[in-house]
Regions:
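N-terminal prepro-regions of secreted/extracellular proteins
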Residues: 1-48
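Short acidic/polar mixed-charge low-complexity motifs
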Residues: 16, 52-54, 116-118
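Short, ordered beta-strand-loop transition motifs
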Residues: 13, 25-26, 97-105
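Short, exposed beta-strand-loop hairpins at the edges of beta-sheets
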Residues: 107-129
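Generic short beta-strand segments
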Residues: 36-44, 76-79, 107-113
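Residues that cap or initiate secondary-structure elements
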Residues: 13-14, 66-68, 112-114
């Protein structure tokens, strides 16, 4: 449960059924892909046990010219759950912390309420395209 697989779930050159309709103007890219992936968030202090790790799953649209990424949209979170079955997670969010023509790094955060409130954080890097 530690690593969430990254799956390309849509390619605008091949697939008909969009998963997340892009907000970007078509002129700025040749095609786009939607990826489904996730980030594992860990806590510190009283919440540092790996048994409390949280998985945040999300979709992200990435725009390409030729084989190079030229932009992206805000990730769309689809869920948060305990990697090992723990509960009490809320407020999942994922942002793109950096990206280049062939790589994208995400930062995930969520709250865990279990006797106290803890902030869980993690990062995930995916290769493009």
């Amino acid at each position: 449960p530690e690593t969430i697989e990254t799956i390309e779930v849509y390619d605008s050159r091949l697939d008909e059924k969009e998963i997340i309709k892009p907000q970007s103007a078509k002129a700025s890219y040749d095609y786009y892909k939607t990826y489904r992936t996730g980030v594992t968030c860990k806590g510190s202090g009283a919440a540092s046990s790996y048994l409390l790790n949280a998985n945040i799953t999300f979709y992200v649209n990435v725009f390409f010219k030729s084989t190079k990424a030229v932009g992206h949209e805000k990730p769309v979170v689809t869920g948060v759950s305990g990697a090992y079955g723990a509960t009490g997670y809320s407020k999942p969010s994922v942002t793109v912390s950096s990206w280049s023509a062939n790589k994208m790094k995400f930062k995930g955060t969520c709250k865990l309420t279990a006797g106290g409130t803890y902030t869980m954080t993690g990062t995930k890097t995916i290769s493009l395209p």
